[in-house]
Regions:
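Alpha-helical membrane insertion/targeting regions
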Residues: 1-204
Length: 204
């Protein structure tokens, strides 16, 4: 744990800075692509450190959040790379794990609710998002629609959602707000409308 946590924090910082560069740079240009790759590998490092930390501490909440957050970066990168819109086996596996993580969050939310742990609200919301995004990507793959503007929109949605996950982690660690679930949900409430607007702009 003493080595994993500093690496985890460093990776989160790198991912957040890289995401900012990717968002602010011109799409398709070298800076955007380099920043996007840096963001992705930062998310990989976050995932690979979060998993053992969650297992060591028996933290099912963190375990599920790790899969949820990494899927967003993974799917975002896959949509950027796959211009033909034909899903590979790894894409189907990833979608299945994302939906399973969402269902797992709902199950854990029930237990948290019984225990009067207010984080059941976070799990309920994130579970819905995981299932919704996973199912949307599943339909996109099945119908082979991930080409042209639709591909860019799916890339945008997943990458920005992953960025929300990183922003959320920073907020949760550094800001003490009550109730406990509020810092987990607040970035999503504020930034999801931005994603929706950006998608509309891409698709019109």
């Amino acid at each position: 744990m003493e080595y994993l946590l500093p690496i985890h924090i460093l990776a989160g910082t790198i991912a957040l800075l890289a995401a900012a560069f990717a968002i602010c740079s011109e799409k398709g240009k070298k800076i955007h692509i380099t920043a996007g790759k840096t963001y992705y590998w930062g998310m990989v490092c976050i995932f690979l450190t979060a998993l053992p930390m969650s297992i060591i501490t028996s933290n099912v909440f963190l375990f599920l959040i790790a899969f949820f957050s990494f899927y967003l970066a993974f799917a975002g990168r896959r949509f950027a790379q796959n211009r033909k819109g034909i899903a590979a086996i790894v894409d189907w596996i990833a979608v299945g794990l994302m939906i399973a993580a969402g269902l797992g969050m709902w199950v854990l939310a029930v237990f948290y609710s019984i225990e009067n742990n207010s984080q059941y609200i976070t799990l309920t919301v994130f579970g819905f998002i995981a299932i919704a995004l996973g199912y949307t990507d599943y339909k996109t793959y099945k119908q082979q629609e991930a080409t042209g503007k639709k591909r860019i929109a799916r890339h945008l949605t997943n990458m920005l959602a992953g960025t929300i996950a990183v922003v959320t982690a920073v907020l949760v660690v550094n800001v003490d707000i009550e109730p406990q679930w509020l810092p987990w949900i607040l970035p999503t409430v504020i930034l999801v409308p931005v994603i929706s607007w950006w998608n509309w702009k891409v698709m019109k």
